[in-house]
Amino acid sequence: MKKSILSFCVLAAVVFSCNKKKDSQEETIKSDTITAEKQFSKADSLVNKAIVAHGGDLYNNADYSFVFRGKKYRFQNNGQNFEYSSEVQKNDSLIKDKISNATFERYINNKLQTLSKEDIGKFSEALNSVIYFATLPYKLQDVSVNKKFIEEITIKGKKYDVVGVTFSQEGGGKDFDDEFHYWINKQTHKIDYLAYNYRVNEGGVRFRSAFNTRVIDGVTFQDYINYEAALETPLKDLPKLYEQGKLKEVSQILTENVINNNK
């Protein structure tokens, strides 16, 4: 009888120890999860507020066209589905590019073209890039986007939250290793400045200042002055160089003749 009681006590102690260890492991996992959420939640929250300020849910079913550098563009969103297109006349050829979800097509004078894998990648990246910048910050909610809160700073007397963005290789496009910073106005929650570095064509660093901000049927569109900085300049140093007039203007990013096709 004593032997049975002793065996029961040993078994109970083992079970209690295992349960305690399991509870401890669960608490550790829970603590790690909360820590991870806290680490990224501020950046996510800032970007979500920026998306709302720039158009919010209106992006989900938006259908707008605009002109950029002489070429007509259009983006049509329908929930998770989308279609991006561009159209330009070159001599006797009308060239139309179209991305429908993950499929790229090029038409010349309404005839579908057979393209190499390299050309498909090049043309689709070019089209995606224009729509990406025209609809900022809408695409910053994509699953391939990795966001991180950097700091709070003041530029020309206005306060900003700075969010850093990188992209996962899967779903991040050809230039997934580019790095971006976005300066989000604390008062308006809109993106007044952005910067990025890139690796292709020997690399480079760019800083953009928004101007001509206008709201068209609830969606914000902006133009940008595009500045160049010395190679390897840290992105977080660019606002100070901008205020000091040490950045070189290289171009203007103009989104013109914006039309809401849903009207």
Would you name each region that the model predicts?
Residues 2-8:
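Sec-dependent signal peptide recognition
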Residues 44-45, 53, 57, 89-93, ...:
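Intrinsically disordered terminal and processing segments
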